[in-house]
Design a protein with these regions (language model features):
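Short, charge-patterned binding micro-sites
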Residues: 56-83
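DG-centered beta-turn motif at the end of beta-strands
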Residues: 18-23, 34, 61, 103, ...
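Acidic, polar low-complexity linker/tail segments
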Residues: 1-17, 22-32, 109-116
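Von Willebrand factor A/integrin I-like adhesion domains
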Residues: 84, 161-182
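Arginine/glycine-rich "motif VI" loop of SF2 helicases in the C-terminal RecA-like domain
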Residues: 50, 144-152
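Von Willebrand factor
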Residues: 69, 81-120, 133-135, 153-166
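…and closely analogous acidic/polar surface helices at protein-protein or active-site interfaces
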Residues: 24-56
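Extracytoplasmic/secreted cell-surface and envelope-processing proteins
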Residues: 27-28, 132-138
Length: 182
């Protein structure tokens, strides 16, 4: 009949960015907490994505130590059976400013935010003990001019008892968006 035909409606994309401090100060238990948390949450995110007819959730991972480095070359669907969390290891200095500049490049319709069906505002998870060794403020200032960053949901997760919450709040824009993990 008239209503028997099914038409697949395009899904918009929501990109979750994990920006992970992999510097030497994150060695041991701290980086272990990060790996366990992300590995534990990905199956739940996958389930949410599969159950949502309107949005597909994709993830991007940006590690930063002495320099920032994308682990994922582009957003990866959490529904992709081949995608697995790759444990990160810690070592080096803390180039958060470099990570902010890399993130700024990715938050563009020319790169990571170019889905044909459109994109929801991204979600940014910064995971760090909050002790940058570079000029991170200039990187954050660049990000603050980016429209995707302005629209993004920003959460900073302070790892360890000594996490610098005020620095993490500079990234999110508010103290309320900083969560501590001990």
């Amino acid at each position: 009949g008239l209503y028997d035909e099914t038409v697949k409606v395009g899904r918009r994309t929501m990109v979750l960015f994990f920006i992970i401090d992999t510097s030497g100060s994150m060695r041991g238990a701290k980086i272990g907490q990060v790996n366990a948390a992300i590995e534990g949450i990905l199956p739940k995110i996958k389930e949410i994505s599969k159950e949502n007819a309107d949005a597909e959730i994709k993830v991007c991972v940006l590690n930063f130590a002495t320099k920032a480095k994308w682990v994922t070359a582009a957003p990866v669907s959490v529904e992709d059976e081949a995608y697995r969390w790759e444990y990160v290891e810690a070592g080096g200095t803390t180039a958060l400013g470099d990570a902010c500049r890399e993130l700024n490049e990715a938050l563009s319709t020319k790169t990571f935010m170019k889905e044909v069906g459109g994109s929801y505002a991204p979600v940014l998870f910064l995971m760090s003990d909050g002790e940058p060794t570079d000029d991170y403020r200039s990187g954050i200032e660049v990000l603050k001019r980016n429209n995707w960053f302005k629209a993004a949901i920003k959460v900073a997760i302070g790892i360890g008892n000594d996490a610098n919450k005020s620095m993490l709040a500079e990234f999110t824009g508010s103290d309320e968006s900083v969560i501590e993990v001990h």
